[in-house]
UniProtKB/Swiss-Prot annotation:
Function description: Catalyzes the conversion of dihydroorotate to orotate with quinone as electron acceptor.
Gene that specifies this protein: pyrD
Pathway assigned to this chain's UniProt record: Pyrimidine metabolism; UMP biosynthesis via de novo pathway; orotate from (S)-dihydroorotate (quinone route): step 1/1
NCBIfam families assigned to the protein according to its UniProt record, in alphabetical order: PRK05286.2-1, PRK05286.2-5, pyrD_sub2
Gene3D superfamilies named among the record's database cross-references: Aldolase class I
Record's subcellular location: Cell membrane
SUBUNIT field: Monomer.
The protein's name: Dihydroorotate dehydrogenase (quinone)
Short name of any one Pfam family annotated for the protein: DHO_dh
UniProt source species: Arthrobacter sp. (strain FB24)
Record membrane topology: Peripheral membrane protein
Cofactor entry: FMN
Amino acid sequence: MRVYPTFFRLAFSWMDAERAHRIGFRAIRLAHSSGAGRVLAKFTAPAPSLQTTAFGITFPSPFGLAAGFDKEGHGIEALTELGFGHVEVGTITGQAQPGNEKPRLFRLVEDKAVINRMGFNNDGATAVAPRLKSARAALQRRHPGVRPVIGVNIGKSKVVELEDAASDYLVSARSLAPAADYLVVNVSSPNTPGLRLLQNVETLRPLLKAVGEEADKAAGRHVPLLVKIAPDLTDEDIDDVAKLALDLGLDGIIATNTTIGREGLTSDPEKIRDCGPGGLSGAPLKARSLEVLRRLKEATGGSLTLVSVGGVENARDVQERLDAGATLVQGYTAFLYEGPFWAARINRQLAKHPARR
């Protein structure tokens, strides 16, 4: 019998979602700082058979934590102790910013979903960079072989105009690339005004080219570069982004971010309206995310690393994404509903799957 669903219902379901997130994340970090996390890691570490190589890096497991949970790099080590093969930090912007007004995070428990309009609240690239450097060094010390991987997701500062977006992304790339195992350009969040316009290939091409060059220069090595796209793109737009990624020699595409759609929800319509605008994540995104993955697989012919995220709840979902062409799979929303042993449970079940790769 699993205890966490009952604990969630009693302790967290009545609480403001953002406050519950803060408390839960603090508990995870406390387990690490007390030493309990290291003991826990002996039981949650992915089986060696799960090791996966993507863009020249070996990951302990194909399953990792998507951007959004640890926005500022405060708990990277602690989260890897729960079994995640990689942790994607962010979204981080060139300038520190408070994000949108609260409340800005809402649960739709009946749908196992979340609506957020956080707005990239973070300390800014300059403040986050030392945390990434420290976490990377610590993971290298603790894992002399294959270690958990640190991804860094960067976005546009809200106060920066769209025409100046490239220079803002370059600030982040310059500061963060040296401590990043891979870098993600986020142009698909619905919560920064105008950001999704950057998904237009004519705008996206020079942005990605500039970020890639700046990241490699700052790090003194090639930093794998990926772009994260929205599920709301048309098939034609998806094909265009795939072609652009191939033309530029990008290392991969992450699909998908949250959706602005509200189709197929079972939660009370009035409750959904009360949540207001924002990106929807969780189980309702499952079908569309898989659809986009398959489209990208066909469009790229397997030439790029595809990272699938959106509606991933269990090992079956992870396996389905791997079978559909993903090299890596990420989750986040189900972590809030399933509890701290979610990643370890998925890894155990994946390791039992004889045809995983």
